[in-house]
Each structure stands twice: as C-alpha cells, then as structure tokens.
Regions:
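Conserved ABC ATPase "signature" region
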Residues: 103-121
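Conserved beta-strand-loop-alpha-helix hinge in the C-terminal portion
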Residues: 207-231
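H-loop/switch region of ABC-family ATPase nucleotide-binding domains
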Residues: 187-188
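Conserved ABC ATPase signature
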Residues: 125-129, 133
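Catalytic Walker B motif of ABC-type/P-loop ATPase nucleotide-binding domains
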Residues: 150-153
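The feature captures the beta-strand-to-loop junction immediately N-terminal to the Walker
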Residues: 40-42
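Helix-to-loop junction immediately C-terminal to a conserved catalytic motif
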Residues: 55
C-alpha cells in the first residue's frame, strides 16, 4: 500500500547553514493509511515542525519528503484560525473556495455542525465563541472537507478539562470514521496519547529517538532499556 507520507533523512533548517537553527534533523519515517500516530517530546523538540512539513507548510532543506497527493489533508492548530464570519460562514467559505456552489457549501456546513453539536450557534460570530467551541468549529470545517488525513498540533492544550474531553471525543470519532483515515497529532497529554494513538514517535532536538507501537512505548522496562531518553520523558510527564 502506498504510504501517506514517506520521509528519508529529512531535515528542516532555518537561517544560514552555518548559523541557523535545525528544527528537524535526519528524520526517516513512513506513515501508512489508517495509522494513528502521536508525536511526543518536550517543547522545541520538532513536533510542530514535523506536522507542518507533512502538511506542506514547511519546506525540507535536506533529505526527501514524499506525500500521497491523492489524499486530502486537513490540519488543526492549538488555536484555531477563524475569520470574522459566522460559524456557518467559516465552514462554508472553505468549501466554496474549493469549488462548491454557495448553497451546497452551506448545506454541507450545516451537516458538519450537526456532527460537532453546534447547530444552535451557526449564526454567531465565530470569534466570540469559547476556546472549546472554536476548536469544534475548526473540526467541523475539517470534517466538511472529507479529508483522509488529519494533522493536529496540540488541539486540546489550551482548553479547560470539559472542553478537552468534548474535543478529544470528536477527534476519536473523526479518526475512526473509516479504516483508511490517517491521524497524526502532537500532544503532551500522555493519557490522550494512550486513548487516541496506535503508534508513538518521540522527538528530541529535532531527531526521532523512538518510534514504537503505543503499547510498547508505555512498557516501562522496554523503554528504559532501549530508549532511555524517551523513558525519562514519559517518567517526567507522568510525575
């Protein structure tokens, strides 16, 4: 099966070669359709840069990056980028810009709002909503586009516990709507990683230091023996 993403010794370097910053270094990995992958690591480890590279928002400066362009992608950020439009308008506009007729775009947007439980807020200015509601609008906007690949950069990090549970439940539903749906997300929440991921990639200083099935990543003895840096990270985050 053709990989969704295939990286070979990929690097991302900002600034001059001699004095810049290497955000990613020599990253090699393959993502298959239907995988649910968590990216973990400390702040500045390269998680966000890797997600942006996968989505095409960052360019690799070394190595090779191959994307399956036949699969539609959607990406959600920690803070949703919503326009000064109604909730419905924020969703419908994206569809219209991709060629849908305005009436069809509005109908698809309304269906997406049903899925995230925001039909009663359809005409509200999206920027007046709470953080959790805004993230649900962003999810609805992605849902309406019917992507086969969903990339998430700390999607619940800035939310209160109740909103966090709601958004995580929607992400879980989104990720399991078909066997071919691919999910790649960055998170500091190890409980969330256990609930959503089937595979975990640990990054440190722009390098992949561990790439394991989720059950092996949380196996203390295995991680401690073979991936001591990842073990220390898990131990610290769980403290």
């Amino acid at each position: 099966m053709k990989p969704v993403f295939d990286l070979a010794s990929a690097g991302v370097h900002y600034g001059r070669a001699s004095a810049g910053v290497s955000a990613l270094r020599d990253v090699s990995l393959s993502v298959q359709p239907g995988e649910r992958i968590a990216l973990v690591g400390a702040n500045g480890s390269g998680k966000s840069t890797l997600l942006r590279l996968l989505h095409g928002l960052a360019a690799h400066t070394s190595g090779q990056v191959v994307r399956d362009t036949g699969r539609a992608h959607a990406m959600l950020f920690q803070r949703p980028h919503l326009m000064r439009l109604s909730v419905l308008g924020n969703i419908a506009l994206g569809l219209w810009l991709r060629g849908a007729r305005w009436g069809d775009a509005k109908r698809l947007a309304q269906t997406a709002l049903v899925r995230v439980g925001l039909t009663d807020l359809a005409l509200r200015n999206a920027r007046t909503l709470s953080g959790g509601q805004q993230q649900r609008v962003a999810l609805a906007r992605a849902w309406a586009l019917s992507p086969q690949v969903l990339l998430l950069d700390e999607p619940t990090a800035s939310l209160d516990p109740h909103a966090k549970r709601e958004v995580e439940a929607l992400i879980h539903e989104f990720a399991h709507q078909s066997e071919a749906m691919t999910l790649v997300f960055a998170s500091h929440n190890l409980g969330q990683v256990k609930r959503l991921a089937s595979r975990v990639i640990y990054l440190e200083q722009g390098r992949v230091l561990a790439d394991l099935p989720v059950e092996d990543f949380f196996s203390g003895p295995l991680l401690q023996q073979q991936y001591p840096a990842a073990h220390l990270f898990v131990k610290g985050e769980s403290a």
